[in-house]
Amino acid sequence: MTIQQIRITGTGSELQGVGRADDGRAVFVPGALPGECVEVEIIRQAPRFCEGRVVRVLEASDARREPDCPCYGRCGGCHARHMQYAETLKLKRQRVYDALTRIGGLTEPVVRETLGCAQPDRTRNKAEFPIVHGKIGAYAAGSHALVPLEDCLLQREPAVRALRWFAKKLPSLSCASHLTALVTRVNRAGEMMLTVCADAPVASEIEKLLPELRRDLPELVSVYFLRQNRRPSHALDGACSHLWGAKALDETLHHLKFELSPQSFFQVNPDQAERLYDCALEAAGLTESSDARVLDAYCGVGTITLAAAQRAAHVIGVEIVPPAIADARENARRNGLSNRARFILGDAAAEIPKLIAHGEHFDAAILDPPRKGADEKLLDALIRAGIPTLSYVSCDPATLARDVKRLIAGGYLLQWAQPVDMFPWTGHVETVCLLSKLNVKHHIEVEITMDELDLTAAESKATYDEIKAYVLEKFGFKVSQLYIAQIKRKCGIIERKNYNQSKKEDAKVPKCPPEKEAAIMDALKHFQMIP
């Protein structure tokens, strides 16, 4: 046994502590926090790094707390229940910042504060509980060893009740050895769909349970059986058969209606997904209705495409997976957006040049690629197309930074990055980036002072968009640029001449309502523009 004292100086991709071992190698220590001094047992060694286990915390961080889950440290579902939630948001922002500087090569990129959950527990609408040798629970971190569960703080209450029901029932089931997983979906209305997965044709045995299930789980509206393929890649890899109730689960997202089957892809945290989509639309310049034409280069089943179509004149979604395009077209029909959203089956890298050649133009493009990032050919196609605004949605900071670097080399500027916490208590972070095309024919680098711009020190501290975003996040309503300008003038913050004023001498200018004035004043104080 090798025990060392380690000073933790950073965090890894799963929010594990990172420090230096005695020989200088990086050591990853789950459960340790930046700034802490911990006694660590080295449990795994590699040529360039090692992994350790906390034996004792010698100097604790102020952000440390007692984990609130009895399975934490054994179950692999959470990485960060030993720290305050606010600390996880700071570390996720830092992870995005570090990726953009170290991998993207940027100097002081604008990375906003992470948008966290109002309530970080019970956020997920889908659960996959593995069943192994007749017992149900979750997999241990990094293995397929089962950890029995009676609760999961990530999941909604109906899913937990289903978990407990099967935990009690499994010992008496003759088919228990063939069952492999229980998958639950719970919509915003609290209704639940159950899918029982097995490696043998035991659907008739599950059908016998329906009267008890319906009696004991009042939220239940749909039950499916899934016979898994011989070597399944995931729990739902197989053929579904409907046993009882509704064939689809109704759900809403961004004022859109969707019907979900057991195998449908859908965001697992709809509240945060809406905030993510709002950021993506903001980056695409779609904060309100416009005549913009937008491209969605990885449209999937069309959730972001249709959210954009609510505000843009026309959106074209491109996706290479045939079932996803079929679902996207049906979702557009269901929401009455078929006339504003068109979907193309194909590789976006090949389809973009075709669209441009046929006279199509785009004011903005939205990219939401898989974890591996965007295809190089797609990025090159976007660069050649010269689309002025890119809204890049990423689930991996490293591949995001790599792609941003390529886009910058192609003439784009990174304006800002907005981390969003879609998966509380884990190391995962979603990020939205706004990249704008720099027309080199019309731009040169110059150095000017605030005096030359007639810009006051107070005015320079926050942009109108930052003030708008602050008010929307804190108060839940939007404020116009005109109202902000009125309140800034009222506070003595000098605006540039005629800024935001009508050119008509007799124009009637709407006055900022009291509640919006109070919100704007709060924002000005937050940004230290007024005392």
Segments predicted by a language model, with ranges:
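Short, acidic/hydrophobic/Gly-rich beta-strand patch recurrent on exposed beta strands
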Residues: G17-D22, G137-G142, A328
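Rossmann-like S-adenosyl-L-methionine
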Residues: T2-R7, S13, P201-T456, Y464
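Extended interfacial segments that mediate partner engagement and assembly in macromolecular machines
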Residues: V55-P67, G73-S177, A203
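Short Lys/Arg-enriched helix C-cap and helix-to-coil transition segments
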Residues: E495-E505
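DNA-recognition alpha helix
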Residues: T463-F475, A485-C491
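Terminal RNA-binding accessory module
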Residues: M1-C71, N339-R342, A350
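Phospho-regulated, low-complexity intrinsically disordered regions of nuclear gene-regulatory
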Residues: K461, V509-P531
